[in-house]
Curated annotation (Swiss-Prot):
Its EC number is 1.15.1.1. It catalyses: 2 superoxide + 2 H(+) = H2O2 + O2. Keywords: Manganese, Metal-binding, Oxidoreductase. The lineage of its organism: Bacteria, Bacillati, Bacillota, Bacilli, Bacillales. One of its GO terms (cellular component) is cytoplasm. Mn(2+) binds at H43, H98, D180, H184. GO terms for biological process: removal of superoxide radicals. The gene is sodA1. It comes from Bacillus cereus (strain ATCC 14579 / DSM 31 / CCUG 7414 / JCM 2152 / NBRC 15305 / NCIMB 9373 / NCTC 2599 / NRRL B-3711). This is Superoxide dismutase [Mn] 1. One of its GO terms (molecular function) is metal ion binding. Binds 1 Mn(2+) ion per subunit.
Length: 218
């Protein structure tokens, strides 16, 4: 059995086994100069693909999970058999996080939040600049590897971070925007300058996509 996923782009059959790949919605150089082509290529084809491969391997033989989306799996880890729970947490989380990440980036991104999300950010944080400062702090101070997030938690916006590939979905929180702060996401271009990478993120955030996520979550 291979993972069923609602964003399947295409399937490649090798020796009767299906490998599920994900949509990558733009060219690898589309986010330059902020996110460079080589990093995005490796990030997508190597790192993200490894999470999918490992997740499919973990789910092999678990027909009871065949109809679960990756989001359902990471949101309900206690329902996943204990023998594969850690693998699903790490690799399912990595798959869900990266899938989300690609969809909130855009070559036409940047600027200001829009719609009700803009109003909610202003109300919660006082200003867009104050929000960016809090989000940047969450990303910069995440020790080791992890993610910075703007989430909806019990109907309210919240800035948070998660370690490794943990998903906010596991905590019952719904992501609105997220930033991968693993070194593989930025080291080729920014080396150890994580704050510079975080600053570049604001040039490629798709606020229309974030507004849609917010509307679905609140």
């Amino acid at each position: 059995m291979s993972l069923k996923w609602q964003y399947i782009n295409w399937e490649e059959y090798n020796n009767g086994k299906t490998r599920i790949y994900q949509i990558y919605p733009y060219a690898y150089d589309a986010l330059e100069p902020h996110f460079d082509k080589e990093t995005m290529n490796i990030h997508h084809t190597k790192h993200h693909n490894t999470y999918i491969t490992n997740l499919n391997a973990a789910l092999e033989g678990h027909a009871e999970l065949a109809d679960k989306s990756v989001e359902e799996l990471v949101a309900n880890l206690n329902e996943v058999p204990e023998a594969i729970r850690t693998a699903v947490r790490n690799n399912g989380g990595g798959h869900a996080n990266h899938t989300f990440f690609w969809t909130i980036l855009s070559p036409n991104g940047g600027g200001q939040p829009v719609g009700e999300l803009a109003t909610a950010i202003e109300a919660k944080f006082g200003s867009f600049d104050a929000f960016k400062e809090e989000f940047a702090k969450a990303g910069a101070t995440r020790f080791g590897s992890g993610w910075a997030w703007l989430v909806v938690n019990n109907g309210e916006l919240e800035v948070t971070s998660t370690p490794n590939q943990d998903s906010p979905l596991t905590e019952g929180k719904t992501p609105v925007i997220g930033l991968d702060v693993w070194e593989h996401a930025y080291y080729l271009n920014y080396q150890n300058r994580r704050p510079d990478y975080i600053g570049a993120f604001w040039n490629v955030v798709d606020w229309n996509a974030a507004e849609k996520r917010y509307q679905e979550a609140k």
